[in-house]
Amino acid sequence: MNPSIIKQLIEAGMAGAQVEVMGDDGVHFEARVISEAFAGKLPLARHRMVYATLGDKMGGEIHALALKTLTPEEAAKAGVA
C-alpha cells in the first residue's frame, strides 16, 4: 500500500475533501483530511467517516493510520488550509 492509493480512496469516498497522506514503510501512515462534512462532528465520528472510505484495507494492508481531521475553518485557523 502506498500513500497515493490511500489518498485516492479517501477522496473518492469523501467528495470535496482535501487529503494529504504520508508514510514510507507501506503499513503505517498519517493523513490530514479537510472536509466540510466534519462540521458539527466529534473526532471519533470524523475518524469513522475516513475509515469507512478505506473499507477492509484498515487492519489489513493498512496496519495503522494516524488521522488529523479538520473542517476548512479549523484548517484556516491552524494555518494548514
Residue ranges and their predicted role:
Residues 22, 32-34, 68-70:
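Solvent-exposed beta-strand sheet faces enriched in polar/charged residues
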Residues 51-81:
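C-terminal structural segments of small proteins and small subunits
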Residues 10, 49-51:
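Sequence-pattern detector for short linear motifs
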Residues 1-26:
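N-terminal first-folded block
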Residues 1-5, 26-43, 51-56, 63-64:
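Conserved N-terminal glycine/acidic-rich loop preference
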